[in-house]
A protein has these predicted regions:
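Mid-protein regulatory/catalytic core that forms ligand/cofactor-binding pockets
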Residues: 1-62
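Extended, solvent-exposed segments with strong compositional bias
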Residues: 53-108, 124-127
């Protein structure tokens, strides 16, 4: 899946960080709480990291999932936040990739910021991806991307 966000950063600004927050989990038919999936994140075609989702969650209604959505289907995910700055890439405040930093993303020279989320061909756990938006899951938010600059 690829999302394109408008880039409002001027090429005269210095980008300090990019932050992203989203609710997601693995994907299988119906749901399966123990169903790992290796989900890889890219920004502007630069690979950032791979996170292994532990499962495709159901068994109870998500806090914001509509009553019309069947209980036999995926209901909620995990809220994950990552940040790219001069020190590298952090996931939930833990450094996961010190080899890519904010300058590698070339944000100032692009009209859009491209976020790609996928299961790579060589992934060990190929369990698919569920991404939740506003009014679904346990967190009432869409994908949130913010860029800090000076």
């Amino acid at each position: 899946m690829t999302y394109k966000f408008p880039n409002e950063i001027k090429n005269t600004e210095t980008v300090k960080s990019l932050n992203l927050s989203l609710e997601l989990c693995s994907e299988t038919m119906y749901y399966r709480d123990k169903y790992p999936s290796d989900i890889t994140f890219f920004v502007n075609d630069i690979e950032l990291f791979t996170w292994t989702s532990p499962g495709d969650f159901g068994g109870r209604r998500g806090k914001y999932t509509p009553k019309s959505w069947p209980l036999t289907s995926t209901q909620f995910g995990l809220l994950k936040t990552f940040k790219i700055d001069s020190k590298g890439v952090t996931l939930d405040n833990i450094l996961v990739n010190p080899n890519v930093n904010i300058n590698d993303l070339n944000i100032q020279n692009n009209n859009v910021i491209t976020l790609t989320i996928k299961i790579k061909e060589d992934a060990i756990h190929k369990g698919g991806i569920n991404i939740f938006g506003k009014n679904f899951g346990d967190y009432n938010q869409s994908i949130i991307l913010t860029v800090t600059s000076i």
